């Protein structure tokens, strides 16, 4: 009598297939478990984990916690991938713009919105990789999440399309004191307080950047025509002036709330950035504001 068994089968392969089916069944039961007002899934998790962690030594408990976190992290990642696939299918059917027009639309939105769109689905992510989308990089709405790495990545993506860069926190609190606020202390002589602190501490945003945050502009700065920097706190002059000197095609420069000396910046612009049409420099620690519009230049002390 001939055997009807599959010649390619083996106890090991059969065991693996059974384990996969068993695992699929467990996960399917978990994710399809119906919601019930009388049963809190969260409370069930707590009860099960508390019970499991109540026995065994510390090393076993640690392994259980790590294993649980890892497996639910895998479930979360898998859910996100499946959700993105569904979104890609939906958007590919309902999105009526061709990729060329989509790229143009993406190039008109702020960079935070661009990143949110690119995370929606693969189709939008592919469009968001086009350098034209980074023609205008505006990170003012994402200041809490921006650091050297993010800035460098976006500048690299822009390739030769970069023309405008906005960085920092636009709505950061300004300084209410000017340079004329301190002379009254002369009247008090030696009786003046030994310690005096005026103004606000630099915004927390500045701590996300290092001295080298603008270094990529040494290579791509000549592409920029507009550069706006807001409230980055204290900056090293040389680390700022060297990249700025590469921005020879700037026509619009705005620096607000950055504690650097303004005079060296003006001297550098006079030498290297002769195309400037609009210039606004504000430094509350010096109590000075410089504005240049076309051929008009004036100083507010």
Curated annotation (Swiss-Prot):
InterPro entries: F-box-like_dom_sf (IPR036047), F-box_dom (IPR001810), LRR_dom_sf (IPR032675). Residues 91-146 form the F-box domain. It holds the Pfam family F-box-like. This is F-box protein At4g02733.
